[in-house]
Amino acid sequence: MKRVILHIDMDAFFAQVEQVKNPALRGKPIIVGGDAGHRGVVATCSYEARKYGIHSAMSSAEARRRCPHAIFVGGNLTNYVYISAQIQDIMNDYTPIVEPTSIDEAYLDITESYHLYGTPEKLAQDLKDNIKKRLQLTCTVGIAENKLLAKTASDMNKPDGLNTLWMNELEEKFFPMEIRKLRGVGPQTEKALKRLGINTLRDLKDYPEKKLSQNFGLHGEHLSKMAHGLSDTPVHSFEEMEDEKSMSHEHTLYEDTSDLIFLKSLMITLTDKVVARLKKAQFLAKTVRLKIRYSDFSTITREVTLNSMTDDVNTIYKTALTLLPVDDVVSNKVRLVGVGVTKLHEAVETPQIELFEESSISKKGKSGDVVEDIRDKFGKFSIVRASSLPYRWEH
């Protein structure tokens, strides 16, 4: 049975909420963020302001220069969170499987419920109408068979849009797209792909996966899969996340940063903490997750399921690294990083190894056990990885 996934994206959410609160602001260029005279930045802006090239994370001074008659609003995060909760309540009326990814975006799995409305499109339109009727807010909805395509579909038709991107529509709608439109392809990856003669998603789809892997490592395999429109990441409701056995550690940075060396060293520290808990609880993990929250409070969560269960710190860390959206991190400062593992099972048996063959995994496992013994006896900072020192110097 094919999945049916919605991606809901509230249109210029903060600005819309301000316009609902003060109807005199409707139709005007609204900028939510710090005042231009106090080194502020744009949190978001109305579509009227976007016509002047204004966007999130732009300095307020530059925004003022581009649109001198723009109206700056300080914003009210408490009110935005309250309205966001009301939107989620409405979404929960259509399916219990709702995964918010930020204050103004969410994925819904409507595989089991869309038939109550006849078609996925009719359910999506009813949801849009309901949000507009109850809250006077518009949103854009993308409909597809997976999260990747649903998000892409919503990006195609903003604002106040409804768009599908089924597998049989890829030839017409998806493959002709420029590679920079693919989620996870930022400026640096785009340049590298174009050097290989890859300019569109069709080019990327047709490029040999083996060569992509040679150029981009594990990320190359991921790029090839996405270029074919494939993604098997499930929609996780809060209830599922709470019920699922998992362990994770997060860290909110004192100052937002795009420093990759710092972020990677922080990921090592977080992975160490997760693995220490795994070993202490005698669990093995099958799935690795990475969580990134940017300075604008948008959040992404990526995960990958391994071929076998593990509690090996190197395996988990290297897997988490493949999930790091390097280009996005470089262009958008990060405020929070989280590393986690799920699908846990008790480590009842020792993994079987080939007779007469030295196992590198076995050696790594033994060294990891020794490290944990030392930490238990002398403290968690008695032995650390050299590569995590850039992060530890800050603490």
Predicted features and spans:
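Acidic, metal-coordinating catalytic segment for phosphate/diphosphate chemistry
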Residues: 308-395
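Active-site-proximal helix-loop elements at catalytic-domain edges
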Residues: 1-8, 100, 245, 340-350
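A glycine-rich phosphate-binding loop feature that marks nucleotide/adenosyl-phosphate handling sites
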Residues: 145-148, 229, 284-294, 336-345, ...
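Short, hydrophobic beta-strand segments
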Residues: 106-112, 301-304, 351-357
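DNA-contacting surface of Y-family translesion DNA polymerases
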Residues: 7, 181, 191-333
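Gly/Gly-Pro- and Ser/Thr-rich, intrinsically disordered tail segments characteristic of DNA damage-repair
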Residues: 1-225, 238, 361-395
